[in-house]
Curated annotation (Swiss-Prot):
This is ATP synthase subunit beta. It comes from Histophilus somni (strain 129Pt). It is found in: Cell inner membrane. The gene is atpD. The lineage of its organism: Bacteria, Pseudomonadati, Pseudomonadota, Gammaproteobacteria, Pasteurellales. It catalyses: ATP + H2O + 4 H(+)(in) = ADP + phosphate + 5 H(+)(out). PROSITE patterns: ATPASE_ALPHA_BETA (PS00152). Pfam families: ATP-synt_ab (PF00006), ATP-synt_ab_N (PF02874), ATP-synt_VA_C (PF22919). Its EC number is 7.1.2.2.
Length: 457
């Protein structure tokens, strides 16, 4: 293959000069003699290409020799990747030796065509009451977990992986994009303890890594998930955190010399997001269900990054700081969270009616809160008092102890089937549990546990 030399280094962006008749293509992988991999982003003319470094550019200098591999970055795929931790290039970082996969795939691939795509409306039960009731997930759908800093995106995601791996025994791919290394480490040990590590492939490009790694690691994970899908499996693809993917794009974009757009984001924000999201789809052979944590800067949902992400999702799970401050976990906001699946034709009339009934009562309670704050409970009509009492029970019943949080809470985790969830909330709406104190509904699984807890009070 052709060889060139480094002529300029600006942080993670490196210019390499090649002979005029052997200029690398955009997205080709280049190898520096020091062992670093570069990816071509732009052809500047005169044989010069501008690349991003997929690794630290420490120690690089002008004049170093660069080889063109002639192909995009390729990563190992298939069952050999299960139970392993890899970096953006698909190299193992868990000190367990080579991956040894029979096949490697390029990380840049075309999205499936219209003919290949399938549209299923099958539900994926998560065992988390508030999600199954208010914003049910579709098999092969896309889910966003929205929340500011520290409201529980990662914990919710870990619980989903644990529940789905154990209850549905499916394969998962987890892409850690620009998140804390400590969380990645905790996550690995959590998976080992739950005995589900052999069903998960882990790909990490964490906070301390250069922007090139964080920008490409989501594509590395997605490529591994696509391989499982094309083998006819139903695979889960988890991304934590999609905002850091956007942020890495912003860093790279500025270094590449592009003009910034709104709030300083890259002008190619919508396109970069689309390239990733359009590949996360289900075909007639298998499905990819994706769960993406979305950090919301300063709790502002109108920020260009979360706003662009919203457009691609089937379900949005919004985590609220106000609910977290009440001590109700998972801190999912039942009035803000949505799902395309919440339709009588998909979930059935009973589920739809119960979910809308729960939202109706909580909305009414929200309106009455101002009156209660000024005039007190005594000024409310009897009907409104009943609404408030039921709403407070519903609020507490939406909380649930998690398996992955047992270490912190000391209470064992609970998995609640969709049938039990609907039955429980229907009972509260119908007034069957009006005589039970609201404390009994807090941090329990099914409605039977509420009755048990009430007996001890």
């Amino acid at each position: 293959m052709s060889a060139g030399k480094i002529i300029q280094i600006i942080g993670a962006v490196i210019d390499v000069e090649f002979p005029q008749n052997a200029v690398p293509k955009v997205y080709d992988a280049l190898k520096v003699e020091s062992g670093l991999t570069l990816e071509v982003q732009q052809q500047l003319g005169g044989g010069v290409v501008r690349c991003i470094a997929l690794g630290s550019s420490d120690g690089l200098k002008r004049g170093l020799k660069v080889e063109n591999t002639g192909n995009p970055i390729s990563v190992p795929v298939g069952t050999k990747t299960l139970g392993r931790i890899m970096n953006v290039l698909g190299e193992p970082i868990d000190e367990k030796g080579e991956i040894g996969a029979e096949e490697t795939w390029a990380i840049h691939r075309a999205a499936p065509s219209y003919e290949e795509q399938s549209n299923s409306t099958e539900l994926l039960e998560t065992g988390i009451k508030v999600i199954d009731l208010i914003c049910p997930f579709a098999k092969g759908g896309k889910v966003g977990l929205f929340g500011g800093a520290g409201v529980g995106k990662t914990v919710n995601m870990m619980e989903l992986i644990r529940n789905i791996a154990i209850e549905h025994s499916g394969y998962s791919v987890f892409a850690g994009v620009g998140e804390r290394t400590r969380e990645g480490n905790d996550f690995y040990h959590e998976m080992t303890e739950s005995n589900v590590l052999d069903k998960v492939s882990l790909v990490y490009g964490q906070m301390n890594e250069p922007p090139g790694n964080r920008l490409r690691v989501a594509l590395t994970g997605l490529t591994m998930a696509e391989k499982f899908r094309d083998e006819g499996r139903d695979v889960l693809f988890f991304v934590d955190n999609i905002y850091r993917y956007t942020l890495a794009g912003t860093e790279v974009s500025a270094l590449l010399g592009r003009m910034p757009s709104a709030v300083g984001y890259q002008p190619t924000l919508a396109e970069e997001m689309g390239v990733l999201q359009e590949r996360i789809t289900s075909t007639k052979t298998g499905s990819i269900t994706s769960v993406q944590a979305v950090y919301v800067p300063a709790d502002d949902l109108t920020d260009p990054s979360p706003a662009t992400t919203f457009a691609h999702l089937d379900s949005t799970v919004v985590l609220s700081r106000n609910i977290a401050s009440l001590g109700i976990y998972p801190a999912v906001d039942p009035l803000d969270s949505t799902s395309r699946q919440l339709d009588p034709l998909v979930v059935g009339q009973e589920h739809y009616d119960v979910a809308r009934g729960v939202q109706g009562i909580l909305q009414r309670y929200k309106e009455l809160k101002d009156i209660i704050a000024i005039l007190g409970m005594d000024e409310l009509s009897e009907d409104d008092k009943l609404v408030v009492a039921r709403a407070r029970k519903i609020e507490r019943f939406l909380s649930q102890p998690f398996f992955v949080a047992e270490v912190f809470t000391g209470s064992p985790g609970k998995y609640v089937s969709l049938k039990d969830t609907i039955r429980g909330f229907k009972g509260i709406l119908d007034g069957e549990y009006d005589h039970i104190p609201e404390q009994a509904f807090y941090m329990v699984g099914s409605i039977e546990e509420v009755l048990e807890k009430a007996k001890k009070m």
